[in-house]
Structure formats: structure tokens, C-alpha cells
């Protein structure tokens, strides 16, 4: 059996919206706007947002100028997904396999917990070759079927969602901040003290038992 997927990695141009933002700008990408393709991309983003709200982590890997691409999230009101929905991103001209390797390391996830969604067949094949355990679905030519394709995967474990799952994007971002702050400390112990981490010990109860089971399963995986 395949492992439940925890991370959905997404391309941007012709995946989250129609058109190439570097050529048309954030105002003219095809998203919403009472156009059948724009509505299809919006539906797809809605489905992704639902997964995110159930604890699935989102990331972006896109060959674009970062500043230009991020304008869509900041300025285009038709966008369903916002920047704070994503745990991390790599928007550059680097090899996508290299970018995915960095993201998996950054989020401390194994490749078999990842789904890679990209409209470009060459990019999909590149990831398949480099990461055999990453799930890389074949995308239909018509974006209006993207939502259906994502639903068909049925690989995301969203049946039993804990409070920790819902806050995972925040946890990842907090962890990245801590790693950056670590560079300012010579002593590892001083860095740990600066974090002011508190540990609460609880008995197993109805509120935390689902999380306890998750941790047991993670320990067994190790």
C-alpha cells in the first residue's frame, strides 16, 4: 500500500491559472472572470484549498520570476489560494528536481508523502525519474478536468484530522524561522534557551488520542 500523501506540490502557469504570467502579467492570467477555463482553474483552486484546510501541505515549484509570479496571489482578486496557504515555494529557473529535493528537506518529508502536479509533461517525467516514490499524475489536456483528476487520486489522508494537522503550515513556517535564528547563535544551548519551548505532559484522553495514534505510527515508521 502507498503511504498517505501529506504534501501537494504545484506548478503555476497553466496549472493554477491559465496563461504565462511572465508574458501577460497578473491582471490577464485566466482565473475566474465568468470564462469557462477561468472558472475551471478557480474550481481547481477551491479543491486545493479544501485539502489545505484538512491538513494537507501545499508548496509551489514554478519556472518564473518570483516577484512577478507572487503578484497574482497578492493582487488578483479572483485567486482562491493566497500566499499564506503555502508552506514554502521555489519560484526560479532552477531544475525542478533540485527544487523538490530542497522542499522535501526543508519540510522534513519523505518523497513518498508527496504529490507533484504540473501541466508540463517534460517536468513530470523529470520528477518521475528523479523521485520514483513521488506520485506524479498525468494531467488531461483540458484544465476543466484538473479538479476531477485531483479527486480521483484519493491518496490524501483527510479522514482523521487533528488540531496539529490543521496548524501544520504554521508549524513549518515557525520551524523555518527557528532555523534562520539559529545562525545568530554560537552556542546550540543558547539557541535552545531562546526558543522558550514548553512541554506539557498529559494523560491520553478523547481530545488527544488521535494525535497519540499518529505519533505511534510515526515511531513505527522510523
Enumerate the predicted regions with their spans:
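Active-site neighborhood of HAD-like aspartate-dependent phosphohydrolases
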Residues: 16-43
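Asp-based phosphoryl-transfer active-site loop
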Residues: 5-21, 127
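Glycine-rich phosphate-binding "P-loop"
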Residues: 28-36, 76-95, 102
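Conserved Lys-Pro-Asp/Glu-containing loop-to-beta segment of HAD-superfamily phosphomonoesterases
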Residues: 100-121, 127
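Substrate-recognition element of Asp-dependent hydrolases with the DxDx(T/V) motif
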Residues: 43-74, 89-91, 199, 203, ...
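Helix-loop element at the rim of GNAT/NAT acetyltransferase active sites that forms part
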Residues: 215-222
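Conserved N-terminal entry element of GNAT/NAT acetyltransferase domains
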Residues: 178-205
Amino acid at each position: 500500500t502507498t503511504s498517505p500523501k501529506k504534501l501537494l506540490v504545484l506548478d503555476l502557469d497553466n496549472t493554477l491559472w491559465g496563461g504565462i504570467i511572465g508574458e501577460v502579467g497578473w491582471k490577464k492570467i485566466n482565473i475566474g472572470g465568468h470564462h469557462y477555463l477561468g472558472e475551471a482553474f478557480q474550481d481547481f483552486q477551491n479543491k486545493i484549498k479544501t485539502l489545505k484546510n484538512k491538513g494537507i501541505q501545499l508548496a509551489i515549484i514554478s519556472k518564473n520570476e518570483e516577484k512577478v509570479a507572487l503578484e497574482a496571489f497578492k493582487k488578483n482578486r479572483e485567486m482562491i489560494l493566497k500566499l499564506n496557504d503555502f508552506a514554502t515555494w521555489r519560484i526560479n529557473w532552477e531544475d525542478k528536481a533540485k527544487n523538490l529535493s530542497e522542499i522535501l528537506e526543508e519540510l522534513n518529508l519523505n518523497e513518498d508523502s508527496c504529490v507533484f502536479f504540473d501541466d508540463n509533461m517534460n517536468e513530470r517525467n523529470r520528477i518521475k525519474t528523479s523521485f520514483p516514490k513521488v506520485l506524479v499524475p498525468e494531467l488531461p489536456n483540458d484544465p476543466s478536468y484538473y479538479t476531477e483528476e485531483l479527486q480521483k487520486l484519493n491518496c490524501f489522508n483527510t479522514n482523521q484530522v487533528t488540531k496539529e494537522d490543521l496548524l501544520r503550515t504554521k508549524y513549518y513556517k515557525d520551524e523555518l524561522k527557528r532555523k534562520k535564528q539559529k545562525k545568530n547563535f554560537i552556542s546550540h544551548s543558547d539557541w535552545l534557551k531562546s526558543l522558550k519551548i514548553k512541554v506539557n505532559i498529559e494523560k491520553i484522553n478523547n481530545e488527544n488520542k488521535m494525535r497519540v495514534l499518529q505519533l505511534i505510527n510515526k515511531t513505527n515508521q522510523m
